[in-house]
């Protein structure tokens, strides 16, 4: 079989995405017990990862479920994107570049709603 294309994942492969403790910091800030943000937002995180909701839906849920005002939603989302986007993993990115034009290259991801635009801008 002849290999004609190579496909890469983004999170954890082309991006280094360590856990920066986003929810723990915000739970402390909001006076919530550990795990409470996930408990309240689980269906929203799922919907955002499979594309069944919009970024506006995420913002609305953060306001309604966590009691955040517009400014705090913006702060939370800025923290979320910092953690979610991580940093470029330059070694596999350079490897992917070297494969072209001999092979078709592609990226597959279950990126969260709104992430694609930020990933394209960052990388």
Segments predicted by a language model, with ranges:
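N-terminal helical cap/lid subdomain that shapes the substrate entry/recognition surface
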Residues: 2-90, 101, 112-117
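Short beta-strand/turn micro-motifs composed of small residues
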Residues: 109
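Short amphipathic alpha-helical segments and helix-helix/interface helices
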Residues: 92-97
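Short, intrinsically disordered, charge-balanced linker/junction segments flanking boundaries
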Residues: 119-123
């Amino acid at each position: 079989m002849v290999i004609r294309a190579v496909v890469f994942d983004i999170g954890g492969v082309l991006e280094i995405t360590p856990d920066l403790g986003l929810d723990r910091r915000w739970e402390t800030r909001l006076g919530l017990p550990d795990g409470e943000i996930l408990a309240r937002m689980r269906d929203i995180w799922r919907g955002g990862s499979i594309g069944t909701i919009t970024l506006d839906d995420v913002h609305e849920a953060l306001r309604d479920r966590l009691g955040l005002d517009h400014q705090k939603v913006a702060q939370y989302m800025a923290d979320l994107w910092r953690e979610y986007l991580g940093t470029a993993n330059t070694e596999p990115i350079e490897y992917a570049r070297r494969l072209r034009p001999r092979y078709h290259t592609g990226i597959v991801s279950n990126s969260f709603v709104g992430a694609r635009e930020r990933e394209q801008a960052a990388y």
